[in-house]
Regions:
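Periplasmic polypeptide-binding modules associated with outer-membrane biogenesis and secretion
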Residues: 1-227
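Short loop/turn motifs that connect adjacent beta-strands in outer-membrane beta-barrel proteins
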Residues: 230-233
C-alpha cells in the first residue's frame, strides 16, 4: 500500500508510524486511523485499525436560498455508490464557497458536513443574513431617509455589491460629508450581521450678515438663515 512507509524487516520508527497514520488519514477514505502494535517472535507487528467512510448515496443541502440545491449539486459532483473521500468533498466545498464570494455573498460559507446512516451527505450552509440596518451619526436626518435608500434588505443574505450601491445612494442624497458601513454580529444568530450605516452630516446651515440704510428706518441689519436638510426629509 503506497500510503505506508514502514516496511517488513525495517526497525520500527515512531516517526515512521506517525507518518503512516497521517498518510492514511490524508487519503480521505478513513474517518479514524489507529496503529496497533503486537509482539511477535520476529519483532513487532503493526496493524492499522481504520474506520472507512460510508458509501455515498446522495447529497442534501441545508440553509441555501441564493442558489438552488440543483445548482449546488453541480458544484459538488460527488459520484454515488463509491466510498466518500473527505479530501475530495473538501475541495468541492471550496468551490461552493468561491461561488458565493464571486457573486458578492462574502459572509456565506459551508458551515458543516455530516453523513447519516443512509450514506447521505448533509451540507449545511450559512449565508450571513442581514438582521438589521441601523443608521448612526445622523442628528438631523431621519432614519427612514437613510434606510429607504438601501437596496440591500434585511432578512436577505449580505451582498457586498448591494451594500456598496446602497452606500452610494445614501451619499448621493447630498446630506452627508461621509458615509461608512460597519458590520456587527447578529443578536439573534451569530452567523447573521447587523449593518451600521455611519454618516457624517455636513453643516447645511448658512448665515448671511449685512447692513443697509433707508431714510425711514435708518441703519438696519440683515440676517438670513438657510437650512438645506430641513427636518431631515
Amino acid at each position: 500500500m503506497t500510503w505506508l512507509s514502514e516496511k517488513v524487516g525495517d526497525a520500527v520508527s515512531v516517526d515512521g508510524v506517525f507518518k503512516d497514520v497521517q498518510n492514511l488519514g490524508n487519503s480521505g477514505y478513513f474517518s479514524e486511523v489507529n496503529p496497533v502494535f503486537t509482539s511477535v517472535p520476529e519483532g513487532v507487528k503493526i496493524d492499522f485499525a481504520v474506520v472507512t467512510n460510508p458509501v455515498v448515496h446522495g447529497v442534501v443541502f441545508e440553509g441555501n436560498s441564493v442558489y438552488t440545491s440543483d445548482v449546488l449539486t453541480k458544484y459538488m459532483a460527488i459520484p454515488e455508490g463509491q466510498i466518500m473521500n473527505s479530501v475530495y468533498v473538501g475541495q468541492k466545498v471550496q468551490g461552493i464557497n468561491a461561488a458565493y464570494a464571486r457573486d458578492g455573498y462574502m459572509l456565506a460559507h459551508v458551515d458543516g458536513i455530516a453523513v447519516d446512516g443512509n450514506g447521505m451527505i448533509h451540507i449545511h450552509i450559512v449565508e450571513g443574513i442581514v438582521e438589521d440596518i441601523v443608521p448612526a451619526g445622523n442628528k438631523k436626518t431621519r432614519n427612514k431617509v437613510i434606510t429607504r435608500e438601501f437596496v440591500q434588505k434585511t432578512g436577505k443574505p449580505f451582498n457586498k455589491f448591494l451594500v456598496r450601491r446602497s452606500v452610494e445612494r445614501v451619499y448621493n442624497l447630498g446630506f452627508f460629508d461621509d458615509v461608512n458601513v460597519r458590520m456587527l454580529p447578529g443578536e439573534k444568530d451569530p452567523n447573521n450581521v447587523i449593518i451600521e450605516i455611519d454618516v457624517l452630516e455636513h453643516k447645511t446651515g448658512t448665515i448671511t450678515l449685512g447692513a443697509g440704510y433707508s431714510k425711514s428706518d435708518g441703519l438696519m441689519g440683515i440676517v438670513e438663515f438657510g437650512e438645506d436638510n430641513l427636518r431631515g426629509t
